[in-house]
Amino acid sequence: MEIKSLEKTDFNTLFRAFGRAFADYEVQLNAEQLRAMLTRRGFDPTLSFAAFDGAQIAAFTLNGIGNFNGVPTAYDTGTGTLKEYRGTGLATEIFRHSMPHLRRAGVGQYLLEVLQHNTGAVSVYRNLGFETVREFNYFCRANTEIVDRGDTPRLPHSVRRIDPEKFASISSFWDFTPSWQNSFESIGRAAGDFVSLGVFTEEELAGYCVFEPASGDVAQIAVKRRSEERRVGKEC
């Protein structure tokens, strides 16, 4: 078994390994979706690593590189082990192998997310010294099941496309800092995939949202504090 970077590994090889590693996962990605995910999350193959059994990938960690809260950061875009290699500690070996390379690249912190019910992964990360800093809720619903009940009076407003980064006040709308994949840096890596809309009352920005029409993913939605939050949010 040899651990090395994914710099010389083609996408199709990576996609096959990803598909096998996550075959029993809640969400399945096709090739186009995986490519889009890697782009958005800042995947860097030179700082991503895999354990190879001959020519076959046995386990891997795909790292995104960027900044988070002002600190150069590596983000675990995906760690997976093929079923026949599970229980061998490969994920831990890959992580330990990667750390000197990440430090030399100037990375100051490592960030990851894990499903809470994936207790095996949680245990691995805790044993590596990771601590939980916050928890996310994830909501998903089919478009056909979303109903506008019309019980909220509409506002006198205008809705138009915006560039959120040009509004210095937007971060003051937030109740929390967006996650890595929903940050402006990540959105900017795939800017053509997103639409940003602002809700204006008397030409003042009262709320905004950033979403990906192809997937229905709402990356950010926030309203100005002390505004009529429910109605502005609903307009978004």
Explain the meaning of each model-derived region.
Residues 50, 56-65, 73-75, 80, ...:
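Conserved beta-strand in the GNAT
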Residues 82-84, 88, 116-117, 225-226:
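Active-site acidic-Proline motif in GNAT/NAT acetyltransferases
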Residues 82, 111-121, 140-142:
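Conserved beta-strand-loop-alpha-helix junction that forms the acyl-donor binding cleft
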Residues 102-113:
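Conserved GNAT acetyl-CoA-binding A-motif
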Residues 88, 92, 104, 116-134:
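Conserved active-site alpha-helix within GNAT-family acetyltransferase domains
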